[in-house]
From Swiss-Prot:
Its EC number is 6.1.1.6. InterPro entries: Aa-tRNA-synt_II, aa-tRNA-synth_II, aa-tRNA-synth_II/BPL/LPL, Lys-tRNA-ligase_II, Lys-tRNA-ligase_II_N, Lys-tRNA-synth_II_C, NA-bd_OB-fold, NA-bd_OB_tRNA. GO terms for cellular component: cytosol. Keywords: Aminoacyl-tRNA synthetase, ATP-binding, Cytoplasm, Ligase, Magnesium, Metal-binding, Nucleotide-binding, Protein biosynthesis. The gene is lysS. It comes from Vibrio vulnificus (strain CMCP6). This is Lysine--tRNA ligase. CDD domains: LysRS_core, LysRS_N.
């Protein structure tokens, strides 16, 4: 018998066993409906305690102290295990045991045909401690709140199918503590970022999720149709142009934490729907943003994890201190010491397209005919340097032709005052001094339109209203976007974006 046939046989046997258990549980529910109130789904039990809080408050007390206290609590949660007379009950803060003596067990059997793993129960009783030192609640009052009709996957050797973890996240969260913890960390990261920004006098705002003209980033948008207006609209790829309109309007410091949508591929680093924090700061430049980013990330790591050092794969990354800063050109040279063409390259050579195509092909980049010199430089960097940036690093010196919204460098107008922030071998943030020259922005938008007509699907659209806004005057401003999903990946030591998005995009099941 081949492995494939054997696996199929095991799966069929597991499915048959599961169907049998589901049928048994449905039969139990039918009996419960006949004998219990609310058609077997009561909604009048109220808990007054959480397992985690009880552990903190009473975990150090002795068995005798707890007996003297006779502290009565009401808890509720999902039955995760049955160990003799003990039930293990799980809820949002953790787990606690409940003790059912013989009389209680008899009532449970008579009234509910016995409890199953996965059932949700409410329990009232005094708090005690076992001989092993574990807290438990003596079951004096109890009520089955929800009958689980499907068994949890431990019955079938755990939730081992990675894809099923994402499709049935609700089951993953029940049985996988690491998964639950990752999303607790995510929530804390969001709160820490929001509190930090507010402490720096930034105002949180909300801008449109549907755009008439998609803009603010180089990406393919999702297209929809507004029936009442009879016009196409686009799910936003970035909030940038609306946020900068607010700076024009006089809000000098604004930020937004929300979803962006990009109609692109799925990968360990990419999901079509993702969360970004974008902020804009008048009377500042990109160097100020790098300083602020160092402060923000070290603050978030310390608040959420209690340390600025954390493991990531085989590495230990350090969010504290001053981060490395180098230009894209310098990084390419630094990480390609044995590549003769790259070592001989000068900044002036970057504008030699034939030379850049030759170098790109030599490092296995598949070159598109419409790519500019800046795009070629970025692809060479992405292929040879980016994966090696494990520690926090700001990469500067982005060419203007790949930075259509960034201010040109005063030292060399081929480049812009822009950086991207890398850690763990991936980009996490992008920031720059904003282009506030309306005429230059007009010219760059037109160049983007030409690129789109030449086959670049990710080139930007021309936004006439944004040009009008700039003509009213945008003060010197710097802005940045931080990918929340990728940041959480780092802080939770996970290596695929699906592990930090509750319900990631999935291909249809066969």
């Amino acid at each position: 018998m081949t492995d494939a046939v054997q696996n199929e046989t095991v799966q069929e046997a597991s499915a048959q066993e599961e169907n049998k258990l589901i049928a048994e549980r449905r039969a139990k529910l039918d009996q419960i409906r006949k004998s219990c109130k609310a058609n077997g789904h009561p909604n009048d039990f109220r808990r007054d305690s959480l397992a985690g809080d009880l552990q903190k408050e009473f975990g150090e007390k002795s068995k005798e102290e707890l007996e003297a206290l006779n502290h009565v609590v009401a808890i509720a949660g999902r039955v995760m295990a049955k160990r003799g007379p003990f039930l293990v009950i799980q809820e949002t803060s953790g787990r606690i045991q409940a003790y059912a003596d013989k009389d209680v067990q008899k009532v449970l059997k008579d009234k509910y045909q016995g409890l199953d793993i996965g059932d949700i129960i409410g329990v009232k009783g005094a708090l005690h401690k076992s001989g092993k030192g574990d807290l438990y609640v003596n079951m004096e009052e109890y009520e089955l709140l929800t009958k689980a009709l499907r068994p949890l996957p431990e019955k079938f050797h755990g939730l081992t199918d990675q894809e099923m973890r994402y499709r049935q996240r609700y089951v993953d969260l029940i049985v996988n503590e690491d998964s639950r913890n990752a999303f607790v960390v995510r929530s804390k990261v969001m709160s820490a970022i929001r509190n930090f920004m507010i402490s720096k006098q930034f105002m949180e705002v909300e801008t449109p999720m549907m755009h008439v003209i998609p803009g603010g980033a180089s990406a393919r948008p999702f297209v929809t149709h507004h029936n009442a207006l009879d016009m196409p609209m686009y799910l936003r790829i970035a909030p940038e142009l609306y946020l900068k309109r607010l700076v024009v309007g006089g809000f000098d410091r604004v930020f937004e934490i929300n979803r962006n949508f990009r109609n692109e591929g799925l990968s360990p680093r990419h999901n079509p729907e993702f969360t970004m924090m974008e902020f804009y700061m008048a009377y500042a430049d990109y160097k100020d943003l790098m300083d602020l980013t160092e402060e923000l990330l070290s603050s978030v790591a310390l608040e959420v994890l209690g340390s600025t050092s954390m493991p990531y794969g085989e590495h230990t990354v350090e969010f504290g201190g001053t981060y490395t800063r180098m230009s894209m050109f310098e990084a390419i040279k630094h990480y390609n010491p044995d590549h003769a063409q790259i070592q001989a390259l000068t900044e002036e050579d970057i504008q030699n397209r034939d030379l850049m195509v030759s170098i790109a092909k030599s490092v296995h980049v598949e070159v598109e005919p419409f790519w500019t010199c800046g795009q070629l430089l970025e692809e060479i960097f992405g292929e040879t340097a980016e994966p090696k940036l494990m520690q926090p690093t700001f990469i500067t010196g982005y060419p203007a032709d790949i930075s259509p919204l960034a201010r040109r460098s005063d030292d060399n107008p081929f480049f812009t005052d822009r950086f991207e922030f890398f850690i763990g071998g991936r980009e996490v943030a992008n920031g720059f001094s904003e282009l506030n020259d309306a005429e230059d922005q007009d010219a760059r938008f037109k160049a983007q339109v030409e690129a789109k007509e030449s086959g670049d699907d990710e080139a930007m659209f021309y936004d006439a209203d944004y040009i009008t806004a700039l003509e009213h005057g945008l003060p010197p401003t710097a802005g940045q976007g931080i990918g929340i999903d990728r940041l959480v990946m780092l802080l939770t030591n996970t290596h695929t974006i699906r592990d930090v998005i509750l319900f990631p995009a999935m291909r249809p099941q066969a």
